[in-house]
Amino acid sequence: MAKEKHLTSLDFTASHSGSITRRNSMLTVLGSALALAGCGGGGGAVVAGAGGGAAGGATSALTVGQITGFGSIILNGNGVRIDDSSASISDDDGNDLRGRLRLGMCVAVVTASNGAGNSVAAQSIISSGELQGRIVGTPNTAQNTFVVMGQTVKVVGATVFDTSLPNGFASLATDTIVEVHGQLNANTNVLKASFIEKKTAPAFFKIQGFVSNHNASTRKFNIGPILINYANATELRLTPANGLLVRVRLTAVLPPLALPAEWLATRVRGPEHLAENRGAFEIEGGVTSFTSSALFSVNGVPVDASTAVFERGTAASIALGVRVEVKGSLVNGMLIATRVKLEDDNELDEREFELHGSVANLTATTFTLRGVTVEYGAATLYRRGTVTNLVNGAQVEVKGVATTGTGAATRILATRISFES
């Protein structure tokens, strides 16, 4: 049996009174406030420019993806350093996150760009996780997985654990409340984690996934095994429909034991509300809906790849769940792709991180850089200096990977240290 096509908010969807057209659905999306978030899409607050107005327009650039470096901020392992010193930095509710961004977090970054689309200083950065809730059952140490509200989460080599989980995977236990950043694979329905943080008494839970068993009369639907009631949702930015990728905020109260147990939704949004044209747009993620190799979506963002150049593969390789990096421009809510690069999941599972800054708290085996603990040793390579130049205050560039073992993901193992002037 062919796998069900997942929908984006630009596909035909059902309203309470019947069907609405693709055109009307697009107008609904474009009429919404610009809501952007990280690796797996997600709702958000209005993106504000550095001057306080709405950032955007055809001369601005937008990059959506994972934080892979600091000094200033680096996304998706591309090595481009974006100056965040004057940017507004917040979560998707507008709460200030300055000084609280972490490696592995999923973000949307708006920058200025010239006619060629070359980014300069960031105007705004919005971070948002894909899942927040209580761990159910015992985490599976053999498979490196755990379950939150029916959603299976996979921990990989590049998963970063916040210091609130000091023993990495071993810190996870039944009933621990966590926020997870990552990418949902539309083919396997597994959320591959890029960052995990422990939460204490959060005001709400949240989940992102594909709608199934939608009942417009009772205003209920499923995401995976959980039943969601949105009858009293105070913010409903789209009409739920089977196959649609949605982001739902839930009350942080466990459903009653009596079946069918229902989670109560307070907000339902699409993964991306793209209200402004962008001269340059870049997104890394999984294919979440597929019509053809020329028309698909990435993390809920519709992509027209009819004239794109494909790298590290061909157009025939595009399928549901495949990881890609897409570059182009955003026109009327559609990403007009100029380049589509197919990505290897295994490579990304061991992705390299990059840090720039001043060495602090130096010991014989570790130091701190940009708030991150870095391990170094005999296997570390050096450029423009040697280990004797590694002193507190030294300006360095570090490239490395998340370490393995207890507390591994809270540290970076340096594979190369370069001394900077």
Spans of model-derived segments:
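Solvent-exposed hydroxyl-ligand-binding patches built from regularly spaced Ser/Thr
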Residues: G44-S421
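N-terminal secretory signal peptides
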Residues: M1-G38
